Regions:
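Residue-register detector that marks a fixed positional context within folded domains
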Residues: 1-186
Length: 186
């Protein structure tokens, strides 16, 4: 068990956690350690606990966070905690200041970079220009605790990807394209 497991290690603490972080009553959660993630099906939302505690993620998920995940074809498991901090910090700025920022505005300031654990992080393109400041340098050891979220957790207007993708170029495999390519090469 990781450091944040103590927040949800009993039924009473789960009820308290759900109440404190504003989970709807028809949403159910349970704790899963990093080693048990392989047994989880991709129909349930799985989030590191730190994304809720420090990253500002709430259920149902903010539309801007879902748009970010869809844009980059990422599941929440593929993002390090700082991604949630930056995206949710930007979403809060938009809500508080009435801004209409897009994912493209965000990628003007940040770039998505792959980490060593096949996860992705956001890195500022210019050290002096950031949307969200005061982020910790590392969340090492704090992303080992996960919540499996079931029930009515989805945003009613837009849904988030749950199956991990690999970023990069995908091969176009339409049969007509392959046929035309073969003719072109001869």
């Amino acid at each position: 068990m990781g450091r944040l497991a103590k927040l949800v290690n009993t039924e009473e603490k789960i009820i308290e956690f759900k109440k404190y972080y504003g989970f709807p009553k028809d949403v159910h959660i349970w704790y899963v350690s990093y080693g048990d993630l392989a047994f989880i099906q991709y129909q349930d939302l799985v989030l590191p606990i730190i994304t809720i505690v420090e990253g500002g993620v709430r259920i149902p998920m903010h539309p801007f966070l879902i748009q970010f995940l869809i844009h980059f074809r990422l599941s929440p498991l593929q993002c390090v905690p700082n991604v949630f901090r930056v995206v949710m910090g930007t979403a809060i700025l938009m809500d508080k200041l009435g801004l209409k920022l897009t994912i493209h505005d965000m990628t003007y300031v940040y770039r998505l970079q792959k980490t060593g654990r096949n996860q992705y992080t956001l890195v500022a393109r210019n050290f002096d220009k950031k949307l969200v400041i005061g982020l910790p340098d590392s969340s090492k050891g704090r992303d080992e605790d996960f919540l499996v979220i079931t029930g009515n957790w989805q945003n009613p207007f837009i849904s988030c990807p749950l199956i991990p993708w690999e970023l990069g170029f995908r091969r176009f495999t339409h049969p007509l394209f392959s046929f035309c390519l073969i003719i072109f090469l001869y």
